[in-house]
Amino acid sequence: MLISGSSAALCALALPFAAAKSLWSDSPGNYSSFITTAFPLGNGRLGAMPIGSYDKEIVNLNVDSLWRGGPFESPTYSGGNPNVSKAGALPGIREWIFQNGTGNVSALLGEYPYYGSYQVLANLTIDMGELSDIDGYRRNLDLDSAVYSDHFSTGETYIEREAFCSYPDNVCVYRLSSNSSLPEITFGLENQLTSPAPNVSCHGNSISLYGQTYPVIGMIYNARVTVVVPGSSNTTDLCSSSTVKVPEGEKEVFLVFAADTNYEASNGNSKASFSFKGENPYMKVLQTATNAAKKSYSALKSSHVKDYQGVFNKFTLTLPDPNGSADRPTTELLSSYSQPGDPYVENLLFDYGRYLFISSSRPGSLPPNLQGLWTESYSPAWSGDYHANINLQMNHWAVDQTGLGELTEPLWTYMAETWMPRGAETAELLYGTSEGWVTHDEMNTFGHTAMKDVAQWADYPATNAWMSHHVWDHFDYSQDSAWYRETGYPILKGAAQFWLSQLVKDEYFKDGTLVVNPCNSPEHGPTLTPQTFGCTHYQQLIWELFDHVLQGWTASGDDDTSFKNAITSKFSTLDPGIHIGSWGQIQEWKLDIDVKNDTHRHLSNLYGWYPGYIISSVHGSNKTITDAVETTLYSRGTGVEDSNTGWAKVWRSACWALLNVTDEAYSELSLAIQDNFAENGFDMYSGSPPFQIDANFGLVGAMVQMLIRDSDRSSADASAGKTQDVLLGPAIPAAWGGGSVGGLRLRGGGVVSFSWNDSGVVDSCKADLSARGSDVSQVKFYVAGGRAIDCSS
């Protein structure tokens, strides 16, 4: 990174900089407040949360595929799809809505038996008896290495513990060591379920927990803990009932934890009878644990750290520490955080968001759910499922831009294997089309693609269009044409095919445009009914979906010219979903019926501003439209008024950032941290449990928008070779003065790094554009105020 010498020197003298790379506390977490006090570990598939208790440690354990319900509870499970088609009701629904402006879709609603839920796997217990005279305690989660540690003294004995979850070895590892000798240690696996109760057994130096979520047909799950005592001659018979007991006197003990289920997403199709069932996991888990236990602790840790840092270190953000916060426990910093803010904490949570994504999304895992990977509950809020009218999307907002694009494979596989097969049936049974696929707002891991029973939140077939935005983003940043042809484009094309079949001429305004009918804004009106036509959110999404089909046509390798012609034809008359209403707002519906100061948590009518681009890029220079965006944001409130969610605030922060309104962007960001982030850094839905991870990831996205404006461009601009204008530092607050960023990915390929002065104005930059293809447009960089800046040297 190029930083001008005088600027860097002045910043170093003016403000201290501290690497905000660890969460720490001088006291253990609280078992009764596990989800707000424990520090999380993960390798994509496996999750662990050590509480850090002195002598009776509890580590909460998760495996990402452990769900009850679906075909593991009933052979009649259908993904919510009806037995017979309901599509015959659509013409009448549409006619009524065009005649009256609003209507309902009650004929399309359905029940969702056997939907199921994500659930906790077990607790690992580590009992060292009664310890006294505890002194010098500290626990720490190092974000640089993804290693948890704690240490303390008990009398003359110093005890240190470390834990991590390794992607290369597919296990979590926990180690205890001492300067003299460890007390007797009893290791156990516990699960409180009684119906059906799992079987816990011990053999040699291993504990196995084996269970099923439902009698006979339930999902099989297996967890194994293998204990290793380096240098000891007795490691073959450590069992005591169903626990492993290591005698007093050892200096080092470590264990490996492996787990799996018989869930198999690739069997979620008609060929496999939508069984989602794979092989019994017992032998695989046994082999994984056995292989890992043969390695030394140092070898396991070394491969884990090398793998993790190979991803995490692709991006850096450095903000100042004006308050000397690095010297205070982060649990205190987060508990006492208040506006106007603390750059050290904001930097910490940015790094933490990237850490959490690496820990919950790895090739071969499921994508992060509403709680990422971590739950201590048998029945987490909203089933710990996948909500896709903002939450799943927000989880992936900043992934590609911050160097984590290679970790998105779980999302594409999940969509292709659990949404598309069942979603093709849903398209036919609810919407009368054999073209493409559709799903709705709430999904499990068993292909639940049908509409649930409350229209206000269940009627959301636009999930396929919004998730196609993420398909395009991944291609745009990576420029991986092979991935786009083989994986991304089939998802996007199927969504576009569905919407080609559903667009109808506007018979209310009779303006010749194509609109969606029926629709409603996510979890919002316009009425209690609550369907209407031409919803802004839908129209913007479909406009961008069709635009991406055309923009990526060459890269797709598709020779289906009839499909392309259909897209081109309907794109030309599609209502783009940008209407300015009677009080200067971006209308939420084509009908101008928005209520001023409606502080609903969603910003659905501003999708095209952020994270979309039809407003921000295509019409971003139109002051009438940008004024309407501002009016809408002020009217919508701060996100406190409706449910006080963290995700609503960081969405607002990102929108303000793209308007270059720094004070509002920073205010919303700091408000989210103040109101919603617990002492362990997890985002709490309304400021208290339940935990919902979207704002952890969304905060990263919002901060990226404060750092850079690199909006997507329309297919027309791209084909015309229009220069890609990138604004560095659209909304950097003065509190972050003298900071820097390294490794920001650019659309079309390339990386930019830059630093800024004490006022938040970028004064030095360096770009590496070698990854850009010859057919990608040129990039020009600007700073606040519209001044061009040379990033070439």
From Swiss-Prot:
Gene3D superfamilies: 1.50.10.10. SUPFAM superfamilies: Six-hairpin glycosidases (SSF48208). Its EC number is 3.2.1.51. Residues 1-20 form the signal peptide. Glycans are attached at N30, N83, N100, N104, N123, N179, N199, N234, N323, N597, N622, N660, N757. One of its GO terms (cellular component) is extracellular region. InterPro entries: 6-hairpin_glycosidase_sf, 6hp_glycosidase-like_sf, Alpha-L-fucosidase, GH95_cat, GH95_N_dom. The keyword Secreted applies. GO terms for biological process: polysaccharide catabolic process. It is found in: Secreted. Coiled coil: none annotated. It catalyses: an alpha-L-fucoside + H2O = L-fucose + an alcohol. One of its GO terms (molecular function) is alpha-L-fucosidase activity. Alpha-fucosidase involved in degradation of fucosylated xyloglucans. Hydrolyzes alpha-1,2-linked fucose. Belongs to the glycosyl hydrolase 95 family. This is Probable alpha-fucosidase A. It comes from Aspergillus niger (strain ATCC MYA-4892 / CBS 513.88 / FGSC A1513). The gene is afcA.
